[in-house]
A protein has these predicted regions:
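P-loop NTP-binding core
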Residues: 1-309
């Protein structure tokens, strides 16, 4: 989507994009948890979901969380689509958590691709800054801005990259995830060259892997640097693979730390056996480790993006 010179918009100092070139590596989960983490620290936080996938880690759609803005619905990406198509400020759902506002993604975001391509024929490459323009009126209100991006489409990924200051790149250890980073590397270079020279790769990291597989991790780090560059920072924290607590938390629309808080009053396996509770009522003890891993990863991301405490 990039080819010509554009009038630049300086991205907010406090903006971080979570991006990669392949789905299924934890990108949306990481973005939601990073935003929730900074909000829990008392920082006014905005999460912008520039993806057509219906990710709902925060329970916005399923549980109706947050205060909807006046007017038409903004869920399923409808609000983001209208802001871009009407060239108007973003309309987030307020207080999805204390201090956390969210511009949800969803199906309507995918419809932006055709709109952007149509506008590019008459307006040129400047359309890649459409999100940056819609964000600009709101940005001063927030201490932290997090972008979840779309690995399924270059145009959408570039839209988020053009509005962000920092890029962090998650990956799994498999070859397809590593090779998928070539897409984000290509989009990063294009956006930085022609639309957002302030964009920086803050680092990359492994997600949902065995923390004790250190030999394999060393190999993966080399693979990452081959794709993103030898100078790429690789974060030390590896969030372990714990599928059951992660799945349970997401079904309840809870962040890992929130789900972990339910453990002391959780039903136990013997309650299920006695018919006093359902399996879904039992909070797995593994959520403690998962919550701690995610907290440590969030702190490392913020440290390398100049926002650590």
């Amino acid at each position: 989507m990039l080819s010509d010179s554009v009038e630049l918009i300086e991205p907010p100092e406090n903006s971080i994009m979570v991006g990669t070139g392949k789905g299924g590596v934890g990108k949306s989960t990481i973005a939601a948890h990073l935003a929730g983490h900074t909000a829990a620290q008392g920082k006014r936080t905005l999460l912008v979901c520039v993806t057509s996938q219906d990710d709902d880690d925060l329970g916005i759609k399923r549980f109706g969380r947050g205060i909807q803005p006046d007017g038409p619905s903004v869920v399923d990406g409808q609000g983001l689509y209208r802001s871009i198509s009407e060239r108007s400020p973003l309309m987030p759902i307020r207080e999805v958590r204390p201090n956390l506002d969210v511009v949800p993604g969803g199906v309507a975001v995918g419809e932006l691709v055709q709109l952007l391509m149509h506008r590019m024929m008459t307006e040129g490459v400047g359309v890649v800054l459409s999100l940056a323009r819609s964000l600009a009126p709101l940005a001063p209100w927030y201490d932290q801005i997090v972008f979840d991006s779309a690995p399924e489409n270059d145009s959408l990924e570039q839209l988020a990259a053009a509005a962000a200051r920092y890029l962090v790149v998650p990956t799994r250890s498999d070859d397809s995830s590593i090779s998928g980073m070539q897409r984000i590397a290509r989009n990063f270079k294009a956006v930085r060259k022609q639309a957002n020279p302030s964009l920086r790769v803050a680092g990359a990291f492994l997600y949902a892997s065995n923390p004790t597989a250190t030999s394999m991790h060393a190999e993966v780090k080399e693979d990452i640097r081959e794709v993103l560059g030898n100078g790429t920072t690789i974060f030390s924290k590896v969030v372990g693979y714990r599928e059951k607590p992660a799945r349970n938390a997401r079904k309840k629309g809870l962040l890992f730390a929130e789900y972990a808080e339910l453990l002391p009053t959780s039903a136990r396996s013997y309650d299920v056996a006695a018919g006093r509770a359902k399996v879904a009522d039992v909070v797995p003890e593994a959520i403690i480790g998962l919550s701690g891993d995610m907290r440590d990863l969030n702190n490392e991301i913020l440290l390398h993006c100049g926002r650590g405490d």
